Amino acid sequence: MAQERRGSREDRQNREERDSEFVDKLVAINRVAKVVKGGRRFGFAALVVVGDQKGRVGFGHGKAREVPEAIRKATEAAKRDLIFVPLRGGRTLHHDVNGRHGAGKVLLRSAKAGTGIIAGGPMRAVFETLGVHDVVAKSTGSSNPYNMVRATFDALKNQMHPKDIAAQRGMKYATLQARRVAAGAASEE
């Protein structure tokens, strides 16, 4: 029987090729302590955002006794939990959207070409790994990086492609696009 063994050279090469397409950003690193009978055991917790800069992004959390191991665990967790976000023109969001997690609230707004990423710390890392070039984001409430990242992902999960919105409303995509163009022209006047 000619079955491939787990951990074969081809398997490792495929995994390395798959991993090389992703960009990862370290969002936060914390020193954590576990209290045991003899005192405290110190370790590290890492929050990492991973994306392919083409619309797929994920975040992960990892804990270990050493920093590199915590980052590796967080990166693997992020790669296991990727979401796809439809982008307009491969550069911005299709529509404005709100997200929240705990006390953290975020507002994400699509922006014109050339605007850049106007977002604070953890949200900026999410947009850079997602592949968004133009976006305006505002976070209120909690400034905890974990809550900000989770609130941003909550908002991104609610992002819908106009074709899906048209299908949901029972109208044609062209009609929806015509309304969008007309609304854009009216707002410029």
Curated annotation (Swiss-Prot):
Biological processes annotated in GO:
translation
InterPro entries the record matches: Ribosomal_Su5_D2-typ_SF, Ribosomal_uS5, Ribosomal_uS5_bac-type, Ribosomal_uS5_C, Ribosomal_uS5_N, Ribosomal_uS5_N_CS, Ribsml_uS5_D2-typ_fold_subgr
Key word Ribosomal protein present in the record? yes
Name the keywords, alphabetized: Ribonucleoprotein, Ribosomal protein, RNA-binding, rRNA-binding
Superkingdom to which the source organism belongs: Bacteria
Give the GO cellular component terms, alphabetically.
small ribosomal subunit
Q: Which Gene3D superfamilies match?
A: 3.30.160.20, 3.30.230.10
Instruction: Cite a single GO MF annotation.
Output: rRNA binding
Could you tell me which residue ranges the S5 DRBM domain spans?
22-85
Q: Does the keyword Ribosomal protein apply?
A: yes
Q: What is known of its domains?
A: The N-terminal domain interacts with the head of the 30S subunit; the C-terminal domain interacts with the body and contacts protein S4. The interaction surface between S4 and S5 is involved in control of translational fidelity.
Family membership, please give it: Belongs to the universal ribosomal protein uS5 family.
Q: How does it assemble?
A: Part of the 30S ribosomal subunit. Contacts proteins S4 and S8.
Say what the protein does.
With S4 and S12 plays an important role in translational accuracy.
Q: What is this protein called?
A: Small ribosomal subunit protein uS5
Per the UniProt record, the lineage of the source organism begins with: Bacteria, Pseudomonadati, Pseudomonadota, Alphaproteobacteria, Hyphomicrobiales
